[in-house]
Amino acid sequence: MRGLSTKPVAIIIAILTVHFLFAAVTSQSSGDFVPIESKCNGTIAECSLSTAEEEFEMDSEINRRILATTKYISYGALRRNTVPCSRRGASYYNCRRGAQANPYSRGCSAITRCRR
């Protein structure tokens, strides 16, 4: 088995070099992959302050998803500095000792693989 000869490898390297040089010369970008226009025309300090304010004004995707799961806010959640139920694994709505957090209420079927 012979190794690769140097002539085809040199030709491939030359073609790739010419291709990349041609692409670099004809590109419209100034080094960025995606041209982005600046929205702020002030100083760096002014622009960074406006960006920080916008960051806290926008609601995060996670907050929107969490709030979208329920259509109401309970009175307990509106009280200040309180934990709804401090018992580990207990339901917020049923904080009694021994109460199940998520009681199983579906019937038994082959799909759920429950014991009979």
Swiss-Prot record:
Organism superkingdom: Eukaryota
Key word Iron present: no
Any one Pfam family match given in the protein's UniProt record, by short name: RALF
GO cellular component term of the entry, any: apoplast
Glycosylated residue positions: N41
Tissues showing expression: Expressed in roots, stems, leaves and plants.
Any one Gene Ontology molecular-function term assigned to this protein's record: hormone activity
Cleaved signal peptide residues: 1-23
GO terms of biological process kind: calcium-mediated signaling; cell-cell signaling; regulation of growth
Function: Cell signaling peptide that may regulate plant stress, growth, and development. Mediates a rapid alkalinization of extracellular space by mediating a transient increase in the cytoplasmic Ca(2+) concentration leading to a calcium-dependent signaling events through a cell surface receptor and a concomitant activation of some intracellular mitogen-activated protein kinases.
Keywords of the record: Disulfide bond, Glycoprotein, Hormone, Secreted, Signal
Principal subcellular localisation of the protein: secreted
Site for Required for proteolytic cleavage, residues: R64, R65
Protein location: Secreted
Positions of disulphide bridges: C85-C95, C108-C114
Modification after translation, per record: Proteolytically cleaved, probably by S1P, a subtilisin-like serine protease (subtilase).
Protein name: Protein RALF-like 33
Phylogenetic classification of the source organism: Eukaryota, Viridiplantae, Streptophyta, Embryophyta, Tracheophyta
UniProt record similarity statement: Belongs to the plant rapid alkalinization factor (RALF) family.
Propiece residues: 24-67
Transmembrane segments: none
